[in-house]
Structure formats: C-alpha cells, structure tokens
Amino acid sequence: MNDKKFDKIIKRLKEDSRNKSYTERGIPPIFQVSPKAQILIIGQAPGKKVEESLIPFNDKSGEKLVQWMGIDRDTFYSEKIAILPMDFYYPGKGKTGDLPPRSFIAKEYHKDILDLMPDIKLTILIGSYSMKYYLGKGMKENLTETVRSYREYLPKYFPIVHPSPLNFRWQKANPWFEGEVVPVLKEMVGKILADR
C-alpha cells in the first residue's frame, strides 16, 4: 500500500472537526484495509463493543458474518479481506438501536481508500445504508427485495442483510436467505480466496 497516501487519509480523518470528539478520546478510525485485499465488506458503522476493542466486527454480528462467508476468524482478519464501514466511528445510541452512520464519511473518504485497493473482486454490501449508497437507483423498493435480487448485482456487489442478532426476526421470516443466498456467498468467497 502507498503508505504516504494512507497516512494522509488517516491524518485527514483524525483532524476532521466532525471527528474531534473521537480523536480527543484517543479513538482512531476503525476499518481494515490492505493492497492485497480481494474481498471488501462495506457495513454500517462500528458498534459500542467494536469501539472498545478497535477491531471491526469483533462482536456477535462478526461471528455470524464469518459463518455466512464460510471462512475462519484468521482469514476474516487477514490482508485478503478489507472492511470499510459507512462510518469509521461509533455514531452513538438512538431510541431503537445505534444511530445511523454519518453520511460524510463514505462521500469524502471511501474513494481515496478504495483507490489503494486495486484487486477487489467482490464487495459485500451489508444493510440498507451501504446498499443505498453503492447501488443507488439500482436498489429495489426495500432491503428484502434487494437481497432477494442479489444475482442482479453480481459479480461486483453482493447485498446481504446485517448479521446482527437484532435481525433474527427478519432471518426467521426469510428462510430463503440462509437456505439459498448464503451458500452462494460462501461459494463465491471460497473461489476468490482460493484463486491466487
């Protein structure tokens, strides 16, 4: 990776006045990037537990995601996998869960970071925020229909529901996801990681 370019991005993030409250508390932007990454995961934003550990998806959601991808934890945190949330910081608690990711992070920082990872073969879009941003008008009327239509976005994007335990009702109401979609995700991830 071009370390100078990457260091400049980190410096910009830390000096951005909108991230001041995090920088002052010693909290760095939380993501995982590598020039050798072949699979990119774009999720929502770090949760409270992730903010405390500073490790992306270091929670129950991450355990489920690793399972859905058909890999182990070591592979998930290897240089083959990049994790770039829609917000690099925990946005705080809302009335019904975490607050949404702040929109400026993806708009102002994603492209510069993505330019440093030229070998991405598959981008897994997790949840509605990443789908709305990256699929734009290509997104269906809701998350469920977008995930159901995942084949339309391949081979570049693979939209999936958030693996949060809070989504257990959705998963129960939509058994086709784990029955039909997850096996395809596992197969694609396996093929990409095996192709060196």
What residue spans do the PLM features occupy?
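Short amphipathic alpha-helices and their capping/turn segments at secondary-structure boundaries
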Residues: 26-35, 63-75, 112-115, 149-151
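Short, conserved beta-strand edge motifs with alternating hydrophobic and charged residues
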Residues: 42, 83-85, 124-126
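Short, surface-exposed acidic-centric catalytic microdomains
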Residues: 55-101
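Structured loop/turn residues at beta-strand edges in well-structured enzyme cores
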Residues: 37, 79, 118
